[in-house]
UniProtKB/Swiss-Prot annotation:
Name of the featured protein: NADH-ubiquinone oxidoreductase chain 1
EC number of the protein: 7.1.1.2
Catalytic activity: a ubiquinone + NADH + 5 H(+)(in) = a ubiquinol + NAD(+) + 4 H(+)(out)
GO annotation (BP), single: mitochondrial respiratory chain complex I assembly
Keywords carried by this UniProt record: Electron transport, Membrane, Mitochondrion, Mitochondrion inner membrane, NAD, Respiratory chain, Translocase, Transmembrane, Transmembrane helix, Transport, Ubiquinone
Gene Ontology terms: cellular component: mitochondrial inner membrane
Protein function: Core subunit of the mitochondrial membrane respiratory chain NADH dehydrogenase (Complex I) which catalyzes electron transfer from NADH through the respiratory chain, using ubiquinone as an electron acceptor. Essential for the catalytic activity and assembly of complex I.
Top-rank taxon, per record: Eukaryota
Gene: MT-ND1
Membrane topology: Multi-pass membrane protein
Similarity comment text for this entry: Belongs to the complex I subunit 1 family.
Transmembrane residue ranges: 56-76, 88-108, 132-152, 159-179, 219-239, 241-261, 282-302
Organism of provenance: Zaglossus bruijni
């Protein structure tokens, strides 16, 4: 996973480079392939500085918690076999992704900086708000699936991907994951023009690298979960042996879409971000959820 995260940073820089008519990293190694390793070495051998006024334990614990949670979410994911086949796999994913808010809040509070605290409060409000729609979307999918276990989703989608009947949910989930992972155009927590670097402004060296790894691991996990929920995960009728490769290709395509959006769109204003959720996404997801509750009840009289 960490290797995938390392090369995702390289792919991002390459894609953004080509979109802006330049090469991207091309000095370290052939075609710049060793750039992530060089970045990691540079960050981890630097001295981890911290402000004198910061709260030392919380300051150090926040990045460790962020990375630990980002790697813990992978436990119940079927790829094609999960590490632990949990009965309530989806609830586990939802609860662990909700806990990631604490690492951001701790880092902003412990830094003892106005910029960091403002960025952290924005991040918390944004993440908690979008968690609501993500939870309702997961509930709707579970109503179709009939179980909270992630592995049963492959059986559900054996004949048709769930993206076909539930495409509004897929679109709202994709945009919500952009906001959940603090990516452009919703990267208000790291608004360079106004907050320098957001909640991690006081971090350097190793702890900063841990936040960086956690952010990109979250991007991959969110896209992997979207693939499992809507795109039949690893199911390919004519090539069942290539299950993991198929799953990885779909995840990579969604991740590339993340990067494409980053290169194309400017940053949202904060009130627009909240209006988009509370006035647009929440009604859409609630109505769709009610529809999936009513449909089986309405059709239950048919023998």
């Amino acid at each position: 996973i960490l290797l995938a995260v390392a090369f995702l940073t390289l792919i991002e820089r390459k894609i953004l480079g080509y979109m802006q008519f330049r090469k991207g990293p091309n000095i370290v190694g052939p075609h710049g392939l060793l750039q992530p390793i060089a970045d990691a070495v540079k960050l981890f051998i630097k001295e981890p500085l911290r402000p004198m006024t910061s709260s030392i334990y919380m300051f150090i614990l926040a990045p460790i918690l962020a990375l630990s949670l980002a790697l813990t979410i992978w436990v119940p994911l079927p790829m094609p076999l999960p590490l632990i086949d949990l009965n309530l796999g989806l609830l586990f994913v939802l609860s662990v992704s909700g806990l990631s808010v604490y690492s951001i809040l701790w880092s902003g509070w412990a830094s003892n900086s106005k910029y960091a605290l403002t960025g952290a409060l924005r991040a918390v409000a944004q993440t908690i708000s979008y968690e609501v729609t993500l939870a309702i979307i997961l509930l709707s999918i579970m109503l179709i699936n009939g179980s909270f276990t992630l592995t049963t989703l492959n059986l559900t989608q054996e004949f048709m991907w769930l993206v076909v009947p539930t495409w509004p949910l897929m679109l709202t989930r994709f945009i919500s994951t952009l906001a959940e992972t603090n990516r452009a155009p919703f990267d208000l927590t790291e608004g360079e023009s106004e907050l320098v670097s957001g909640f991690n402004v006081e971090y350097a060296a190793g702890p900063f690298a841990m936040f960086f790894l956690a952010e990109y691991a979250n991007i991959i996990i969110m896209n992997a979960l979207t693939v499992i929920l809507f795109f039949g995960a690893y199911h390919l009728i004519f090539l069942p042996e290539l299950s993991t490769i198929n799953f990885m290709i779909k995840t990579m395509m969604l991740t590339s879409l993340f990067l494409w959006i980053r290169a194309s769109y400017p940053r949202f204003r904060y009130d627009q971000l909240m209006h988009l959720l509370w006035k647009n996404f929440l009604p859409i997801t609630l109505v769709t959820c009610l529809w999936f509750i009513m449909l089986p009840l309405a059709l239950s009289w048919i023998p």
